[in-house]
UniProtKB/Swiss-Prot annotation:
GO cellular component, one term: cytosol
Subunit structure: Part of the small subunit (SSU) processome, composed of more than 70 proteins and the RNA chaperone small nucleolar RNA (snoRNA) U3.
Principal location: nucleus
Keyword Ubl conjugation recorded: yes
One GO biological process term: nervous system development
Regions annotated as coiled coil: none
Cross-link Glycyl lysine isopeptide (Lys-Gly) (interchain with G-Cter in SUMO2) placement: K74, K83, K86, K103, K120, K143, K144, K180, K218, K235, K236
Role summary: Part of the small subunit (SSU) processome, first precursor of the small eukaryotic ribosomal subunit. During the assembly of the SSU processome in the nucleolus, many ribosome biogenesis factors, an RNA chaperone and ribosomal proteins associate with the nascent pre-rRNA and work in concert to generate RNA folding, modifications, rearrangements and cleavage as well as targeted degradation of pre-ribosomal RNA by the RNA exosome. Involved in nucleolar processing of pre-18S ribosomal RNA.
Keyword field: Isopeptide bond, Nucleus, Phosphoprotein, rRNA processing, Ubl conjugation
Protein's organism: Mus musculus
Phosphothreonine modifications at: T90
Protein name according to UniProt: Probable U3 small nucleolar RNA-associated protein 11
InterPro entries membership: SSU_processome_Utp11
Transmembrane segment boundaries: none
Length: 253
């Protein structure tokens, strides 16, 4: 009970504060207290210990010591710079490999491939930026035929339509069919914008399908590595391809 009474008595006790800086020495600057001195002293001793340890390490250094880290380091302006290793797996690939199964990734890849085929059939890859330009080759027997050759006459179409790879009607069709009125400029812009949007979507889906294929290959490679068969790494893993191993040939029973 006495301890409880002592605590209760201390609640009404006067608070003892540390003496502030006297007015007559204010011109000399801030008066350092003991807690300030301890912080300064501890910081000083910590730095001295660190310097002492560095001097000892420099004295005891073996000039013939070697670390494998030295093979990818060089000294530039007195500073050691280490070569950065090439990224083998992206963060998105690593997340997929850790959280998803190979069957799920293969299913998503097949779904993306089907969507790509559907978009290709709708767009017919008209003026697609990633598509290789096709060539139309004409064959002739003599040089005179080559000199007299005219593309528009040969294709039986108007000269203005020669550069088209699609919707290139013949002159007979143009004479028979009724020509529709000119499309407004706003309508043409809207159609071009929608088509560009579809091409962007197609490009993204093609890239995603490639990434899913790479992830599936990397997961399969990691599964194959669980086999105890002796193997040798032939090619390192990169962002766009899995590592390649050569396994020891084993005769199956």
């Amino acid at each position: 009970m006495s301890a409880a009474f002592r605590k209760a008595a201390k609640t009404r006790q006067r608070e003892h504060r540390e003496r502030s800086q006297p007015g007559f020495r204010k011109r000399l600057g801030l008066l350092e207290k003991k807690k300030d001195y301890k912080l300064r002293a501890n910081d000083y001793h910590k730095k001295q210990d660190f310097l002492r340890a560095l001097r000892k390490k420099a004295l005891e250094k073996n000039p013939d010591e070697f670390y494998y880290k030295m093979t990818r380091a060089k000294l530039q302006d007195g500073v050691h710079i280490f070569k950065e290793n090439k990224e083998e797996v992206t963060a998105e690939q690593l997340k997929l490999m850790r959280t998803q199964d190979i069957k799920y990734i293969e299913m998503k890849r097949v779904a993306e491939a089907k969507k790509i085929e559907r978009l290709k059939s709708e767009l017919h890859l008209l003026d697609f930026q990633g598509k290789q330009q096709k060539k139309h080759v004409f064959f002739f027997d003599t040089k005179k035929e080559v000199e007299r050759f005219d593309v528009a006459t040969h294709l039986q179409t108007a000269p203005e339509l020669v550069d088209r790879v699609y919707n290139r009607p013949r002159i007979e069709t143009l004479q028979k069919e009724r020509v529709k009125g000119a499309t407004p400029q706003t309508g043409l812009k809207r159609i071009a914008k929608e088509r560009q949007k579809q091409y962007d979507c197609l490009t993204q889906r093609i890239e995603r399908e490639k990434q899913l294929f790479v992830v599936a290959q990397k997961i399969q490679t990691r599964k194959d590595l669980m086999d105890k068969t002796q193997k040798v790494k032939v090619k390192k893993e990169t962002v766009n391809s899995p590592a390649i191993y050569r396994f020891q040939t084993r005769r199956k029973r």
